[in-house]
């Protein structure tokens, strides 16, 4: 990720009117899967103006596919036990869980209008065991917070001048955000 020039990219204040007109004052998140959605959410919560770009016609498509299996969100194990399951990375995972543990995730889902339950295995699921209501709530909240979502924008790299390049139905598009994150996980296998 490019270092964020916060004074240029912060939303609000006297320059709030400039954020929509000047893409160089915004942060671009490329990828509309869970990693991209959470990045957009966290950047927006930090006061930054955010544009999220997704190659497909909607965000969270693989998330919806994962939800067909009941959408195991997390596990209810106590933090030390949960972290220990990651063996050599247990210390790192333990630190992450200090900031956002299973209870925080359940609260986050509840904030999107989705209640959860702990199954007999200790796994945490949405009450209706579906991904779509969670995704709809998440996208609705991001839009309400001012995140601009651009679908059918396939990132192709940077041009010689350093602009981010996208293929869109309207043709090539170049942008120069203040900073960018590429959250294009979930590479297809096979």
Each PLM stretch: what is its role?
Residues 44-68:
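Glycine-rich FAD pyrophosphate-binding loop
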Residues 70-118:
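Glycine-rich active-site loop/strand segments that organize a redox cofactor
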Residues 6-27, 45-46:
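Extreme N-terminal leader/targeting segments of oxidoreductases
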Residues 46, 112, 145:
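Conserved dinucleotide-binding and phosphotransfer motif residues
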Residues 93-101, 121-140, 185-190:
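Short beta-strand to alpha-helix junction loop
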Residues 133, 140-190:
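Predominantly flavin-linked oxidoreductase catalytic cores and closely associated redox partners
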Residues 25-52:
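N-terminal Rossmann-like FAD-binding beta1-loop-alpha1 element of flavoenzymes
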């Amino acid at each position: 990720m490019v270092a964020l020039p916060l004074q240029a990219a912060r939303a609000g204040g006297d320059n709030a009117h400039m954020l929509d007109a000047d893409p160089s004052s915004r942060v671009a998140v490329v990828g509309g899967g869970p990693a991209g959605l959470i990045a957009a959410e966290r950047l927006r919560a930090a006061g930054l103006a955010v544009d999220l770009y997704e190659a497909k016609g909607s965000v969270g498509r693989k998330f919806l596919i994962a939800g067909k299996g009941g959408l195991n969100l997390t596990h209810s194990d106590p933090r030390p036990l949960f972290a220990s399951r990651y063996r050599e990375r247990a210390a790192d995972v333990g630190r992450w869980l200090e900031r956002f543990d299973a209870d925080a995730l359940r609260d986050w889902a509840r904030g999107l209008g989705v209640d959860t339950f702990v199954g007999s295995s200790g796994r945490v699921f949405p009450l209706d065991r579906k991904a779509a209501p969670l995704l709809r709530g998440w996208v609705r909240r991001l839009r309400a917070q001012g995140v601009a979502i651009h679908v059918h924008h396939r990132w192709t790299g940077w041009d010689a001048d350093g602009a981010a390049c996208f293929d869109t139905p309207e043709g090539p598009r170049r942008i120069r955000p203040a900073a960018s994150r590429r959250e294009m996980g979930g590479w297809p296998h096979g």
